[in-house]
Amino acid sequence: MLYQFIFHTLLRRVDAERAHRVSFAGLRALAAVPGTTRLMRRVLGPREPELRVRVFGREFPGPLGLAAGFDKNARGVAALTALGFSHVEIGTVTGQPQPGNPRPRLFRLVADRAIVNRMGFNNEGSQAVSERLRAHRARRARDLIVGVNIGKTKVVPDSDAVADYVTSARRFADLADYLVVNVSSPNTPGLRDLQATERLRPLLSAVRRTLDEAGRPDLPLLVKIAPDLADEDIDAVADLAVELGLDGIIATNTTVSRDGLATDPEEVAALGAGGLSGAPLKERALQVLRRLRARVGDRLVLIAVGGIETPEDAWARIRAGATLVQGYTGLIYGGPLWPRRIHRGVAALARRDGFASIAEAVGVDVDPSAKPSTASS
């Protein structure tokens, strides 16, 4: 495959962050050519009827979206959707602009098909990013599905964390198709402490109240959690999300664990701190998803992310309770045709297993009472 040849002979030798910046700029330049995004969406986008799923009051053409972290500043939403993603989650965006952590801060573990990052929420801030997204909406109406992932500004003290999130929520209230409160990145000191329910409750309540005051009580609100939470903490967050009337949970963010890696331990240690994404996260992310589905059933929309590489991975997440799935590292290693391969593969797996729609398959491996549609057999 051409991309694999380019990756292994060229891209892997280039600093990971620089490679990302150059390739993303190239994609945006291509998408700027009149008619290109329309053609790309027609060729690469999900078209199989089995893939359509209605979530958050919108019809998603397929389950696979781009996870937060790739397009932090809403610079390439149209271009990324044209690659075949059903939705793009921008961010993480913070209340104030910030440069993130010192470079280098993004590393590939090729032997593990993984990435270690300690980017530190580098972004232009919610004021600038919301203005860019507003301009995009003015040009394209709301034909693209865009989620917004918000986090805490590093220099903001913990005592002002809620106000920082609220600032971003207010700015994106009329622009986002769904809003994600990110309390699970390992790269902002103290951020994961916000996952404790006694701190998460006032935060989520304040964000929900802000959306109500902004005239968007219907804006879907989700929380993104870490894979490193203990089982009882996962249950506590799930229960809180149901209690507060949230719309969903994204499971999971990156992990701080380095267990079971094929890369030499000394090489891994030399990279330093950061969140690990990619194939090594697969099993734990699936475990967390299963636990969430068993806890909340269909009361919340679950979005699965972490270690999804193949159609089989995505299909397993859907059967375990995910209505939508997301990827980032899979795109880096799989190349620009990766979204199309995932969507086509999932459609084939749905047909193989007797489902007329992927919506019928959500949670069937956790809820034995669910069965394929007889009309599809």
From Swiss-Prot:
The keyword Membrane applies. Pathway: Pyrimidine metabolism; UMP biosynthesis via de novo pathway; orotate from (S)-dihydroorotate (quinone route): step 1/1. It is found in: Cell membrane. It comes from the Bacteria. Gene3D superfamilies: Aldolase class I (3.20.20.70). The active site is at S185. FMN binds at A68, G69, F70, D71, K72, T92, N149, N182, K224, T252, G278, G307, Y328, T329. It is a peripheral membrane protein. One of its GO terms (biological process) is 'de novo' pyrimidine nucleobase biosynthetic process. SUPFAM superfamilies: FMN-linked oxidoreductases. Its cofactor is FMN. Its EC number is 1.3.5.2. One of its GO terms (molecular function) is dihydroorotate dehydrogenase (quinone) activity. Disulfide bonds: none annotated. Binds 1 FMN per subunit. Catalyzes the conversion of dihydroorotate to orotate with quinone as electron acceptor. Belongs to the dihydroorotate dehydrogenase family. Type 2 subfamily. Monomer. This is Dihydroorotate dehydrogenase (quinone). The gene is pyrD.
